[in-house]
Amino acid sequence: MYKKLNAKGAIVAEFVMYTTESKDLNSNVEFYKLPGTINSNYLKKFPIYDYKERRISISEKNKNWILLIPYKFKNKEKEIEQYYQSWKDKDTDKNNKVGELEIIWIKSNQEYFSYNVNVNPKERNYVKDSIVLVGTEDGLYPYWNRFIKS
């Protein structure tokens, strides 16, 4: 289903961890454990730039777990990488040929439009400086297809 919708330009923007309720429930959770999820079509409509100011473009054939991380969190690189690597290892079926963890350091202070009226309503439904997973037709976690159907 994702491939059909994706071919028509469908955008995935999942920032449920940034609703008021989720932020209250997760107030003691490290920021890097609360990612958003987007697809590569999102990046076509809402450009995000790496820390060298180059526009990010992700191929649908990329099999990696792609993380976009604001450069201001570079000092937490080890913790962030360990957390997502353990998540990837836990969620990856041994027979599933999932790629590597791929970290792309992005320019700090960028915003993501959430398409969700319950996400940061005072900030016009934008999320600033979130760590974001980028799902592709061939990549991200094994349940990506199920995730986007819900």
Regions found by a protein language model. Give the residues of each.
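Nucleotide-cofactor and metal-assisted catalytic machinery
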Residues: 1-150
